[in-house]
């Protein structure tokens, strides 16, 4: 074979190999694409179902003429499917509470457009915490802010922001409400929003951004709810609602809600005489609430909710150091585990407490007769003994001379346990401060800690002389 024939032969062989490789790559590409689309064809869900993301193997072949290179295998990363929360972890052991968040809304409103609010609270989804409040349909530096001490108007809406973000003009108005509760079941938010006439109000149940159910006032006397987070366990959410006399016998019901739909209603049973503005927390397998007795007791009512059989048991926090305002001073106060103590029972303020074995953690105003100052502490045997007055681990959150307001609890699930946190409403303006014509608030938030902590005071801090009148 002469040199020219050798060159022609080698060229022919190379061309043949290249052609074969080319067609092999086309075949591999066609097979890969076909298999990819076949997967979605065979796994496509019905029209009314959400398609779940599943890991997919994708082959990518990098080709150069003549030579076949390595094939790389990649996994498609899918979001973890949402699951209902069950809150089955134990409660975290704590030594006290550490500072977590403060929104400074009133101070900031001196130089910007911040909503006029009251009745704030905090609740968390599995990833983030959010702050809520009932807006008054106006900003503070707006003449509509005059006379916003009123609780119920058609302009009030439920506001929602990430925790620590003040309610600015871009804040989402979740629903129309002058009383509310919100909670996340692990998949979506549920909002309970009450508005309308005092004698014929409507509660709307909004789930995942859609109105799902509603209920009308059953006693025609200011239907109202918690003003803090509800609780969802395995897809069933519970909310405590009261309708009727604010200083006498009222009609309290516990609603069980699944994806926004009311599936059951239980009447309050047990020994609690008057129940309003409950602060609820998951106590697996049920829900426990500590509430406000606006009629007979300065000791706080307890409502225990059984998720499975819808049964309700109510009683009172035993602690001899009581949590409501007004109340008697600690040396002369008394309590009872089953009944109201009949001490300074009229009026009151939303508050919280939670059990820790036989002990109880609680927060309350420092002043016994008005909403001034705020403190937290643990009462040894305060969950089981009405004579218990041994207080430990006391912390001042707001000094005695500074204003406070409502307070409530929210729960945060950690890797190994469930932590309890609380917020304090810091009310400013009317009726107590007449330099201005409005009433609004900021908040401060603390969470349980097993570590060490110092001292301080975290009041609202706004100078009303610098504020819009």
Short names for language-model regions:
Residues 2-38:
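Single-pass membrane-anchoring alpha-helices
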Residues 32-51, 80:
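Membrane-proximal alpha-helical anchors
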Residues 52-77:
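Serine/threonine-rich low-complexity intrinsically disordered regions
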Residues 79-113, 118-129, 133-173, 184-223, ...:
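Beta-rich carbohydrate-recognition and catalytic domains
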Residues 120, 179-181, 226-229, 276-279, ...:
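Beta-propeller and closely related beta-sheet repeat lectin domains
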Residues 239, 419-422:
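Noncatalytic modules at the cell exterior or secretory-pathway interfaces
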Residues 414-418:
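Surface-exposed, short loops/turns at beta-strand junctions within beta-sandwich domains
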């Amino acid at each position: 074979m002469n040199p020219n024939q050798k060159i022609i032969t080698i060229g022919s062989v190379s061309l043949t190999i290249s052609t074969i490789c080319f067609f092999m790559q086309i075949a591999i590409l066609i097979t890969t694409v076909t298999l990819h689309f076949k997967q979605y064809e065979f796994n496509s869900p019905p029209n009314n179902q959400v398609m779940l993301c599943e890991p997919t193997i994708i082959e990518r072949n990098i080709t150069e003429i003549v030579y076949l290179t390595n094939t790389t295998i990649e996994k498609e990363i899918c979001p973890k499917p949402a699951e209902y929360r069950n809150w089955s972890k134990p409660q975290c052991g704590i030594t006290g509470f550490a500072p977590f968040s403060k929104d400074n809304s009133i101070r900031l409103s001196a130089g910007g457009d911040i909503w006029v609010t009251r009745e704030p609270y905090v609740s968390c989804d599995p990833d983030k915490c959010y702050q809520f409040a009932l807006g008054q349909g106006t900003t503070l530096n707006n003449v509509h802010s005059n006379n916003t001490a009123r609780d119920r108007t058609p302009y009030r809406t439920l506001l929602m922001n990430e925790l620590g973000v003040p309610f600015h003009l871009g804040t989402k108005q979740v629903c129309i409400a002058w009383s509310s509760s919100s909670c996340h079941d692990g998949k979506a938010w549920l909002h309970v929003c009450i508005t309308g006439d005092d004698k014929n109000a409507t509660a709307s149940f909004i789930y995942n951004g859609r109105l799902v159910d509603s209920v009308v006032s059953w006693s025609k006397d200011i239907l109202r709810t918690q003003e803090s987070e509800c609780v969802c366990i395995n897809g069933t959410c519970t909310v405590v609602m009261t309708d009727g006399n604010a200083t006498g016998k009222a009609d309290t019901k516990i609603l069980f809600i699944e994806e926004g739909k009311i599936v059951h209603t239980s009447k309050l049973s047990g020994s609690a005489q008057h129940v309003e503005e409950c602060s609820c927390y998951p106590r697996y397998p049920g829900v426990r609430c500590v509430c406000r007795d606006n009629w007979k007791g300065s000791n706080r009512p307890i409502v225990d909710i059984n998720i499975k059989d819808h049964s309700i048991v109510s009683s009172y926090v035993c602690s001899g150091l009581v949590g409501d305002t007004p109340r008697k001073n600690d040396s002369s106060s008394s309590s009872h585990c089953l009944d109201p103590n009949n001490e300074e029972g009229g009026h009151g303020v939303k508050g919280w407490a939670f059990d820790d074995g036989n002990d109880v953690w609680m927060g309350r105003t420092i002043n016994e007769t008005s909403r001034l100052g705020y403190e937290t502490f643990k009462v040894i045997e305060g969950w089981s003994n009405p004579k218990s007055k041994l207080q430990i681990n006391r912390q001042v959150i707001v000094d005695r001379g500074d204003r406070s307001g409502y307070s409530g609890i929210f729960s945060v699930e950690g890797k190994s346990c469930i932590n309890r946190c609380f917020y304090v409403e810091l009310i400013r303006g009317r009726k107590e401060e007449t330099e201005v014509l409005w009433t609004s608030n900021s908040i401060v938030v603390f969470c349980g800690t097993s570590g060490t902590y110092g001292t301080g005071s975290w009041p609202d801090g706004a100078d009303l002389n610098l504020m819009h009148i």
